[in-house]
Each structure stands twice: as C-alpha cells, then as structure tokens.
Amino acid sequence: MNMLRCFPECGICGQEYSEDEKLLIPRILTECGHTICTGCAGKIKGQSSIIACPFDRIETRIWKKDVTRLKKNFSILEIKQEVKDRKNRVISEKNEKKERNKNGVCDENTNHHASNYCETCDADLCEECWTWIHSISTLAHHEKKMISTPDCQFHPGKSISLVCMRDRCKKRQNRLMCSECFLDKCSDHFEHEHSSLHLELPELRRNICSSLALYHEKEKKILANIGKLREIIATYSYDGEPFFQKKNELLRFRHFEMGEMDQAIKVLENEVVKRVRVLEYKISNQKLDLDWLQKNKDAIVKLSALPNMKLVQRKWELEVTVKRIEKDSAVRRPEFLADCSTCIVHVLSQRPLQIEMIPAFRLEIRECHRNEVRKFIENHSTRISSRSNILRYNCDFLEIIDRTEDLTIYSEGLRLIMIVDLLDGDRDRYFVALEQLEEAVAYEKIIVGLKSYSRGHGEAASNFLTKLADLHNKMPKITVVVNVDRSEDIEKIVNESII
C-alpha cells in the first residue's frame, strides 16, 4: 500500500475507515481478529446478537446486540492519522520551498542568496553551498541549473537587483527595485539613490548579530546590578549578624528609660525598612530596563527569521529596533545604598527616640610615598569599632578600605583620595593614575591632591595636568587640591572627602 496515496479501507464496502463518521469506525471481531466498519457489522448482524465473520465464518457474540460494543481498531486509526500527518508535512515543505524560492534564499544557509538549483536534490543553493555539497563523487554528476532573483513587480522580465536607499521608501517598506526602476520616470524609484541587493543582505545580518551580542552584554550588567542589590538587601535581615551589631551599638552608646528600649528597637527596624524599600525600588527599575531590552531583542530575533527579501524591505524597522538596543537602552547605574554592616546607629542627644542609620564614609587612599593622609586620620580620630574598623573623625564616622569590591558599581559613602607627586616625573605612574581616575565610576566623590605644584613642570607632569583638567570637566565629582605639602593641606583633603 502506498502510504502517501491510500488510506486503510473496509474489506467489505471498500470505504476508507474514519473516526469522524460513526458508520466508518473500524471494529474488531474479537473471536477471529478481523476488522470491518461499523456499518457493515450492523448489516451482517441484523437482529441477531451473533455476527459471523464474512472472511472465515467464525462467530462473535455481541453484547446487547450493539455493534458499537465491539472494540475499535486503534492501530488502523493511528495509521490513518500518521498518513494524514505525513501528507500535511509534504504539503507544508512544498509550500515552504515555494516561499524560499520566491525570496531567493539558499536552502542550506538562509543568510546567502540562492544562485543554483539541483533537480536531483530538489534544492536551491548558493555557489559556496553547491561546491561544498557536490564535492562528494557520488553527487558530483548532479546537473546545475542557474536560477535568478524574483522579477520586479513593476517591470516583468527584469530581475530585482537593487535596493532603494531613500528614507521614505524604507519607511513604506518599498525598497526592492530593478535597473529599469531607476530610469523609469513613472517608477516610485526614479533616480533614487540605490545599492546592490547582494551588498545589502550581509550588512543587515551583521547588524543583527552585533546588536544581539550587545544585548547579552547589557543583560549581563543589569543582572549583576540586580544581584548586587539583593546582596545588600540581605544584610538588613533582622536575623543577621549586622543588624544584631546595630542593636548592640544602641545599647552600648545610649541609656534608655524603662519601656523606651523596645520603642527604640522598633524605630531602628523602621529605619531598616526605609533603606530596604529604596533598594527594592532600584531593583524594580533595573527589571524594567531588562524587560525593555528583552522586548527589543525578541523583535530582532523575529526579524532575523524573515527571508532575505522581506528583511531588506523591513530595513527601517530593523534599524529602529537595533538603535533601541544600542543607544536608547542604556544600563542605568544604580546608586547602591551602603550595606548594614557599614552603617552607624546615630541617636540625637536631645531626642533619644529619633534614631538614624548613617553610612560611614569609606575612604580608599592611594598615596605615592609616605602615607601622610593615613597617618593624619589615625592621629586625629577615635576608633569606635574594632570589628568593622570604624573610626570617628570630628563628628563623622569613616572606615579606611584597601580597594572597592567592584569598580563599576556606584556605592553610597565610597570616597577616593589620590595623592600625586608632580616632581616624580614617572610617566608610567602618571598614566596609571589617570587610568584609575577614568575607571573610577564607583566613587561618590574623588579628591586628587597634587604635591609640589608650581609653574614650569616637566613635559610628563604638564601632560598629566592637561588630561586631569579634561577629566575634571567630564566628572564633576573630582575635586583637585594643590600644594599638598603641609598638615593643613592634608586636613583640607580629609575634610573635603567627607563633606
């Protein structure tokens, strides 16, 4: 039986079995195993409760004289459905093939334009794929037939070979043209600027690939931001060690009257809730950015699946979507709140139940030689927490850190002090200092102290000062303090960093 041409049929009436028509449902005669349709079984049975098989005369008893009580032959029904599915697949493949032929796409590589047809393989192939597939000796004898691009709808017999570059035609999705369109005064593309169709396609595919790569890069950054925000939120847990330390600070530095302690703890918890709420709002903003990116990525993926000719027609739509990913979908840098461990519990002396959680200033200090800034802070501050290395300088709390956890993430209270000696003359040292400043997006404030500042420096120092001035214009958070050679200047730098 040819499965693509015939369906299983009843051996008595010759009609095809069908589950949709009651009389054509295949029924099994259980005593002998033969199958006939429901209609034939009813006719043979008549008024009797016994049916004799028309093929071998073996009798089968029917319960309550109802032939529908006989079991269906599901094997035949499954074969019928499989045949139907296979026919539908063949039709679908043929329709798909026609669509690809219409758009001139290579069957092996949809990014390429088909230029040859193989009748034996029933495939449209570009020159590269033809050579690769037919390099095997058993396929080398296949006949190659040249195929052309679709004809122009306005000039029959002329193949589409050009693409209109006018913005108006892009927006109207009317870009495909032949050589006659350019010369015909009645044409929509008369004397329009144009490009070759075969040059346009690779450029569009490259734009798709680069924008998808940029999407994955931005997605990674946003997910990193969300992860960092969640890490900080976790530090504010009431069951965590940092919050337990804050409650101890409250008990250690302030005496509360009877009944005030519980109220003070409640006020402290409310402060925590406020900070967590801000962090959660920042996460929701990052998620909105991610959703916008994903929406545009999905649009590009959908466009990339189009046949080449349709993709060329919709270039304007592709360009707009790519622009949204490349320019409009900037990764917003969240201004992270300090985590719970770096916050100080501050109780106002006049109002003991007005409690604040204030982040300690975290200072990263990069000095060229003598660590004068570190020594000044150590001599003019009081250590209030050995565990978290918190110092009190005047009325402010600060912590000296070695380096930031992530130089690309802005963080509350994070400050940088950099001291540069202009008499050093070391070009590499100047270059490293500038490089560090350019990448210092994480810092809330940056103080650059210049030692031995005077007119008439060497070439290396002069170049450094010029580039530093440019950086200062681009990054207002940079403050420059000159002539850092006395303790008063060091004090000015420290005070400048924590205001």
Curated annotation (Swiss-Prot):
Provenance organism: Caenorhabditis elegans
ZnF region ranges: RING-type: 10-57
The entry's keywords: Metal-binding, Zinc, Zinc-finger
GO molecular function: zinc ion binding
Top-rank taxon, per record: Eukaryota
Listed PANTHER family: PROTEIN CBG20824, PROTEIN CBG26870
ZnF (B box-type) intervals: 101-147
Protein name per the record: Uncharacterized RING finger protein ZK945.4
